[in-house]
Amino acid sequence: LIVRGIAPNVKNAKNVLDRRTPEVFDILEEITHDHPGLLNRAPTLHKLGMQAFYPILIEGSAIRIHPCVCAGYNADFDGDQMAVHIPLSEKSKHEAVHLMLPTHNLLKPADGSPITVPNKEMVLGCYFLTTVEGNGQKNEKNLPLFDDVSQAIFSYQRGSLRLREQVRVKVGREELVTTVGKMLFNEILPVELRFMNAPVKAATIKTIITRALAIFSKEDVVVLIDAIKNIGFWGATICGGLSVSVFDCEIIAEKAGIIKEVEGKVAEVDQNYQQGLITLEEKKRLSNEIWIEVTERIADL
């Protein structure tokens, strides 16, 4: 501000900053361009709790981050707080760019499995796109036949074909029974990873990213992750969606009987404690084991 003549001294420069004039934001955008910042979410349990990003200035007070890096932070969007740090020295900037960008942190430090992968709504969208409408059991000979994938996609864009309707299409030398949704998903995949003709689930996406990391550079894998994210959100919002009914949450009939049985076991443990047969620590441990066992038992029903 002083160099550009907007303020004559430091005191006046602080006043200009407080007034948030347009010149302040122009200069801020200029100095933040191509300058990494660090985002940290407590508790920092592993190195993915602090990563570097190139900031984009927006209006509002909320920090917006890529949804695929949330797993590394163990973050969700219910008001989590994050600290912002600005590396100033050349060495710290070099470390941020070459070691701390999400591009360099695609794997989980604990076991080396991919952690920066599309999940939740993105998986829902991919699953919706790659499933078949109805029961999918039609006579294959009666299905429409297309010479290649582009013809089938064009037919869908023209409105003469539904997204999850079964069709026959020639892929290379094979004739596959598939859907336009599956074709659109495969279009974003590199040629080496095609053709996936089964419903895409969370484990499938993780497998795709694992295979991609073995074949391609990190930069190419990041582009693939972004593409899966985009088509997943498109499938979960524009094309389809999910609603939960109260009838989806039916209580298992046997649950009341199981709970009553377990409460009897816990009461027996408490009685043993009252009689001095077991210690307080043993009582807590045995009670916890009983409730964990019943939780797993109900989950398996």
Pin down the residues of each PLM region:
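Feature marking long nucleic-acid-engaging regions of large polymerase/nuclease enzymes
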Residues: 1, 47, 56-281
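Extended, highly charged clamp/arch subdomains and adjacent linkers
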Residues: 1-49, 55, 69-72, 188-194
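Gly/Pro-rich turn-and-neighbor structural signature
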Residues: 26-43, 281-301
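Charge-rich, low-complexity amphipathic helices
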Residues: 50, 118, 122, 250-251, ...
